[in-house]
């Protein structure tokens, strides 16, 4: 069963490969994403993050989810030498980590419900589990210069995939060390990681590093990356190609 809804300002697709899955099972996942949006959306006046930014809550009043995200954000800032930073212009915006974290929590929900073969895609960040019809999941990496074109097809099982770039949302990632300088040397960076939370946070940080980001990913155990720069040149990590499905243009 496969369903799509527009939530958190993006399309979210949930596909579960199991004859016993019901619409209620999938709706619980979408309900969870709605709750996450109600907590962390900086566009909603009454969200918890908006109240935090207005100084209406003290730390003791933060929800457990807020405390978790803020702690994970600080951990990521330290692990990336400050290239991941949720504070900008005196405001806190954890969107660079919330999406991957929420997808992973949704995946845990499906596993706890007894499902082992599924796919969750929220705005291009993806968690897959098990397989589809006995084969690994196939995930396409789009050409940032021509969105209808697939440049690589990945074959993955039990992995997270996250892409950071400027093709869809424009300039929304910045280098915290030079916040007023637009990132123009790369346009897309796709990361394969042990789960989508890990892939998402490091994709955001590595993109902020510019062309050096792919070398940061190379040094991370358990991660692979594929970068496309502003000249349409691709650079990828040493183990990336083992996930590439050769001579096949079909994709999810």
Q: What is each residue range found by the language model?
A:
Residues 1-252:
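Mature catalytic core of soluble alpha/beta enzymes
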